[in-house]
Amino acid sequence: MSRIGKKTIVIPAGVTVTLNGSTATVKGPKGELVKEFNPEITIKIEGNEINVSRPTDNKNHRALHGTTRAILNNMVVGVSEGYEKKLELIGVGYRAQKQGDKLVLNVGYSHPVEFVAPKGVDIEVPANTQVIVKGYNKEHVGELAANIRAVRPPEPYKGKGIRYEGEHVRRKEGKTGK
């Protein structure tokens, strides 16, 4: 069983963490994140470390303990280093382009599919078959990347579609003729 909740979170230089009741505010060079946590879980800041503790060992508190610690760590890493997800478009005629603040995908439909990035998330298109989603909020970066991938997920026969960089797509054999 994982003991992720017991690990301390080291606050890097340039990042400030403040607690107001059960609400944590994390400020850093990339941005600011505010999140309210369950008041049953205790969060303490000691020097440049954050400790998360739980009141009892019941199942609900154990689950909240690890989750709270992981979310706080993601917030600290996000405002200091940021997160990015890379996607690649595989298929004949599949391409992406950036028009202003919109991402326009041509992926075999009769119409182009458009995405507008939420506040704090940037979309880059280094090549017409590559998309990079960057931001300081891991949740928003992952959600936007998943929504882009969901437009045309990779199919198992030819492998065409939008996939994460390095994602392995299980391939299937086609039907064999008589």
Curated annotation (Swiss-Prot):
Keywords: Ribonucleoprotein, Ribosomal protein, RNA-binding, rRNA-binding. Disulfide bonds: none annotated. The keyword rRNA-binding applies. Coiled coil: none annotated. Signal peptide: none annotated. One of its GO terms (molecular function) is structural constituent of ribosome. It holds the Pfam family Ribosomal_L6. GO terms for cellular component: cytosolic large ribosomal subunit. SUPFAM superfamilies: Ribosomal protein L6. InterPro entries: Ribosomal_uL6-like, Ribosomal_uL6-like_a/b-dom_sf, Ribosomal_uL6_a/b-dom, Ribosomal_uL6_bac-type, Ribosomal_uL6_CS. The keyword RNA-binding applies. GO terms for biological process: cytoplasmic translation. NCBIfam families: L6_bact. PANTHER family: 60S/50S RIBOSOMAL PROTEIN L6/L9, LARGE RIBOSOMAL SUBUNIT PROTEIN UL6M. Part of the 50S ribosomal subunit. This protein binds to the 23S rRNA, and is important in its secondary structure. It is located near the subunit interface in the base of the L7/L12 stalk, and near the tRNA binding site of the peptidyltransferase center. Belongs to the universal ribosomal protein uL6 family. This is Large ribosomal subunit protein uL6. It comes from Listeria monocytogenes serovar 1/2a (strain ATCC BAA-679 / EGD-e).
